[in-house]
Amino acid sequence: MQRSISLTAKRLFVHWNLQGIGNPPTVPSFFNLCGSGCWERSFASASGDYREILRNRLSDIIKVDDAVDLFGDMVKSRPFPSIVEFNKLLSAVAKMNKFELVISLGEQMQTLGISHDLYTYSIFINCFCRRSQLSLALAVLAKMMKLGYEPDIVTLSSLLNGYCHSKRISDAVALVDQMVEMGYKPDTFTFTTLIHGLFLHNKASEAVALVDQMVQRGCQPDLVTYGTVVNGLCKRGDIDLALNLLNKMEAARIKANVVIFNTIIDSLCKYRHVEVAVDLFTEMETKGIRPNVVTYNSLINCLCNYGRWSDASRLLSNMLEKKINPNVVTFNALIDAFFKEGKLVEAEKLHEEMIQRSIDPDTITYNLLINGFCMHNRLDEAKQMFKFMVSKDCLPNIQTYNTLINGFCKCKRVEDGVELFREMSQRGLVGNTVTYTTIIQGFFQAGDCDSAQMVFKQMVSNRVPTDIMTYSILLHGLCSYGKLDTALVIFKYLQKSEMELNIFIYNTMIEGMCKAGKVGEAWDLFCSLSIKPDVVTYNTMISGLCSKRLLQEADDLFRKMKEDGTLPNSGTYNTLIRANLRDCDRAASAELIKEMRSSGFVGDASTISLVTNMLHDGRLDKSFLNMLS
């Protein structure tokens, strides 16, 4: 269809004004607006036959300096090369994502009097859109139309992409409608660009509907279109729609490729539809679509996460039989699974196999190996693996050190953990919240309360963020070592802060107060709780009341506990039974024992010991011991 350039220009300008843009920016200085002067350089050293490079070796231009040198050769040539040859270079640089350089070279062409053509302007529009400078892209479009060039479908598709990435999806939809009105026929690329934009702006239903509209307009979606829709749906968790689209493709006799199957399989795995993922994998093979390493990695990782390491191992064997080489991701998933299953020998063998296959373990691999050894208290082997990692020029990261430090601290080798912390600092790594919290806990577990407090002060001094876990460990440690006053200062600070306190912290403080004999203060805190108490909270408070022989209050709290829907456990019953026995209330004790047994619990060592002693003293008969056992 013949189109009027002036009519096209008029309609596009109307489109801008309708969107509240006003007139596009003035054009003469639009190259300068992007700040591209930094790419200017002297071309005095440029040499070589640019024609031969443009004709046969343009794909060799992979570095910025090479592109600039070639441009230098071209502008030194007299007469100047044709605009077609300049466009080839600009297009190659744009594919390198060096959009700023493209604009800079365009500016220098303009300075030298080298006229741009439609294709040149289209390249500039694409570059400005990719840099999210939509107003400048519109300025170029306005200039090219004033010069008599009419935008083609590629130019307008670039502009469409700019709208989509500038959070102006309604403008993008309007532009496609205007393109149709002006006689342009949007192609598959145009529609796919808009579909991608719709997904970017959470308009999934519109994106899916657009696929049907494409067909109605005589534009057949291709694999890229379907892949875009499948990817968008899977990212949203709309897996059923993605599977339906797969069926629709089959009905339209469009064969899905491995990328589309991989996208759906990976999504099924992430959303825990393991069996469906395995079935789709089988269907994929039946249809003659060869799975690749990405397919296997998704399934192997998924199976490992669900503890199905034997199935994952079978998939690895299947993979090797088909001559599909596993990569570091494959081995990492399996190594992690074997360690979690306690299969240390198998995990080590996988590491050895990686090396035999010339697959370099990465930081994640070594972190998994080190963590696996630490999990099973094989610290010397963990340290040895750490040294091996460093010897292979694989730099340990903060997670590596945190894993080792945690391993040593758990085994009460806190000094070794501190030594690793020093080594980490020497390597230029800064300890994070996990690092400091782990060392604080390590010192408390080793019985060194002062050092734990010192590390906390250092943490605050170094402005390392503290979290709820840090304070939980700190308060528990302080209360355990009788430092209630210090714990109370920190607790009051937390109450005034914006940090959301959990029940563990409240339980810690209530227990600390009760152990210090401050049962009244503990009761006040219990009554002021803003979150629901759990069984530990009730047990701690009941134990505190019993320690002060406030048995009626303890019994009332026991009843309230059950009314609030918190089920008593063995600790609840045994605490109350012992308190009533010490108070010589045999009837209440007997009633509690019956209730405890009917709930499936038995007397613990402390209760049986107390009953046995009271039997020897003649204060109880054997019926109590029989009830307990």
Swiss-Prot record:
Ranges for the PPR repeats: 46-81, 82-116, 117-151, 152-186, 187-221, 222-256, 257-291, 292-326, 327-361, 362-396, 397-431, 432-466, 467-501, 502-532, 534-568, 569-603
Task: Please indicate if the UniProt record lists Transmembrane as a keyword.
Answer: no
- Keyword Repeat listed: yes
Quick one: signal sequence residues?
Answer: none
| PROSITE patterns for the chain | PPR
Top-level taxon in the UniProt lineage: Eukaryota
Q: Which UniProt keywords apply?
A: Repeat
Indicate what this protein is called per its UniProt record: Pentatricopeptide repeat-containing protein At1g63150
| Coiled-coil regions listed | none
Q: Which InterPro entries match?
A: Pentatricopeptide_rpt, TPR-like_helical_dom_sf
What protein family is recorded? Answer: Belongs to the PPR family. P subfamily.
